[in-house]
Amino acid sequence: MSRFSLRLHYATGRTPDDEPLDALDEVEARELARMRLLLTRDYSEIELRRGERRIDAFQRDHP
């Protein structure tokens, strides 16, 4: 297992929160980050990070 984190950017503009994420590799971590974004409408963007390095980011599609 590798340790990643998700930086959760709120749609309301509230200060982002960091949430730990354990995944087998970056591929699994990306899939879990996408799923996390889809689970709630609270977030406008989720960054996938390893340590201080941003690996990827996913934004919510706006209608």
Language model features with spans:
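Short acidic, gly/pro-rich beta-turn/loop elements at beta-sheet edges
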Residues: 16, 31, 56-58
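Short, acidic, Ser/Thr-enriched surface-loop or helix-capping motifs
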Residues: 10, 25, 49
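Short aromatic-glycine-(Arg/Gly/Cys) micro-motifs in beta-strand/loop hairpins
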Residues: 1-16
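Short, mixed-charge low-complexity intrinsically disordered segments
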Residues: 39-63
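Short, charged/polar surface micro-motifs in flexible loops or helix N-caps
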Residues: 14, 27, 61-63
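Generic "edge-of-domain/loop-turn" microfeature
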Residues: 13, 28, 53-55
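A short, charged, amphipathic alpha-helix used as a generic interaction element across diverse proteins
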Residues: 24-42
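A short, exposed loop/beta-hairpin motif centered on an aromatic-Gly-Thr core
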Residues: 14-24
